Amino acid sequence: MSRGLGDVYKRQVGEGPFVAEKAADGEWNDKLRKAGNEFGAATGRPRRVGPFDAVASRYGLQCQNAGDIALTKLDVLSSFEKIPVITGYRVNGKLITDFPTNVLLDAAKPEVEMLDGWNCDISYCRNWNDLPENAKKYIERIEELIGHSIYLVSTGAKRDEYLLKE
């Protein structure tokens, strides 16, 4: 098994089904887009963004044959009071937790769990105990939802702004 990589939120460039975009209101997505600087490098166009999607992430990790993972961009969520997390999709009234075909993906509506944010700078955090309690709970919930351990968390944009999870 290899080590996997994932972000705490989802983004997409261009058209096509994107369930995460439907999980939060436009204001939340706009704030996320600004916090993560999610604009095209050449065009400046806003990228499509949405909260963490456990269904898509599990599928991606399966495709990577990943064991434990590095979770990036946790700092981007530091200004949010509440953070939505997609736990499943509802398609034609039925809850699904496995990534569907594109035909079903178009019709999918996200099932969302709201987690408490931490609303403070975490870029100084270099070990697990430095993180705010709600940030730890967020990471632990992600681990539960994806069925993989998180071994590293990036806490800022700089190369040395990360921690190894104990």
What are these regions (language model features)?
Residues 1-9:
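Single conserved hydrophobic/aromatic residue that forms the stacking wall/gate
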Residues 27-43, 138-144:
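Short, hydrophobic/aliphatic alpha-helical segments
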Residues 12, 31-41, 84, 114-122:
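Short acidic (Asp/Glu) and glycine-rich catalytic loops that position anionic groups and cofactors
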Residues 13-20, 81-85, 162-166:
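Short acidic, glycine/serine/threonine-rich loops at helix termini
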Residues 17, 33-102:
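C-terminal catalytic subdomain
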